């Protein structure tokens, strides 16, 4: 899994409307930085024994990684209208993230949010989860451990609390929503490569992240958007800011939350991948 907000050097939201040359150059530069951090992580995974690496371009509509500079050994899932948030994660032996940001409400988290800037927070079984936590929970459904994260210091602390022993690399430290103290991209890549290699060595000792079923999900929005008379399908309106969903497992939760359909999984497991 990849994201953009946790990449070294990134401190502002991506502006998809500004068509100025300055913004175009900034976006191209950030796409290259992300691809180079992915390459660094992949190099570490391969050095640690991975036979293949499948990359999920997870920022926005899945168009952010600069494929022109990507390691040719890698495969990428990108684009929108996906059958699931993390398609083919069940084909992997371990999972990880590059470019991680902290969850919504993290006081000093640089560009912290959970799925959308409109969300105040997600909780599953009263456990506060950001995007990494959801990734870990989906992986845990398939008994896949979450072994590595690189990104903001506060994102690293977040996943360490959920997955003790997970190897993390803080390439920057958020000072506020739009400010961070960052390593140079070249230094960040060195750190990521070494961290990913160590993560592969530690993978066998890490337990998958799981929560007891049934899952009780709560979403709180910053603005009042819910109407008790017209609840979202499969959800219960608690108040104008909050809905709750109960599901047998995390797959059913995502089906109800994001309207994914059952049956998207591949029928057979391909070669082991990280």
Task: Give the predicted meaning of each segment.
Residues 9-14, 32, 36-90:
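Glycine-rich nucleotide/cofactor/substrate-binding loop typically near the N-terminus or early
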Residues 138-146, 150-200:
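Active-site rim beta-loop-alpha module in soluble metabolic enzymes
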């Amino acid at each position: 899994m990849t994201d953009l907000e946790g990449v070294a050097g990134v401190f502002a939201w991506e502006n998809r409307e500004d068509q100025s040359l300055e913004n175009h150059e900034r976006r191209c530069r950030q796409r290259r930085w992300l691809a180079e951090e992915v390459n660094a992580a992949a190099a570490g995974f391969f050095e640690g024994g991975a036979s293949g690496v499948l990359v999920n371009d997870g920022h926005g509509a899945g168009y952010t990684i600069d494929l022109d500079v990507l390691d040719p050994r890698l495969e990428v899932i990108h684009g929108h209208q996906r059958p699931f948030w993390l398609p083919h994660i069940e084909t992997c032996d371990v999972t990880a993230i590059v470019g991680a940001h902290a969850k919504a409400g993290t006081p000093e988290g640089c560009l912290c949010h959970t799925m959308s800037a409109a969300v105040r927070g997600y909780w599953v079984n009263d456990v506060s989860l950001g995007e990494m936590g959801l990734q870990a929970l989906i992986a845990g459904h398939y008994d896949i451990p979450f072994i590595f994260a690189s990104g903001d210091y506060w994102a690293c602390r977040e996943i360490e609390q959920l997955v003790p022993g997970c190897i993390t690399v803080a390439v920057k430290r958020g000072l506020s929503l739009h400010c961070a103290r960052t390593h140079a991209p070249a230094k960040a890549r060195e750190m990521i490569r070494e961290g990913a290699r160590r993560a592969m060595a530690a993978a066998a000792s890490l337990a998958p992240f799981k929560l007891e079923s049934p899952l009780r999900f709560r979403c709180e929005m910053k603005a009042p958007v819910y109407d008790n008379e017209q609840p979202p399908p499969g959800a219960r309106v608690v108040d104008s800011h909050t809905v709750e969903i109960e599901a047998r497992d995390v797959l059913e939760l995502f089906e109800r939350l994001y309207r994914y359909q059952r049956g998207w999984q591949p029928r057979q497991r391909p070669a082991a991948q990280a």
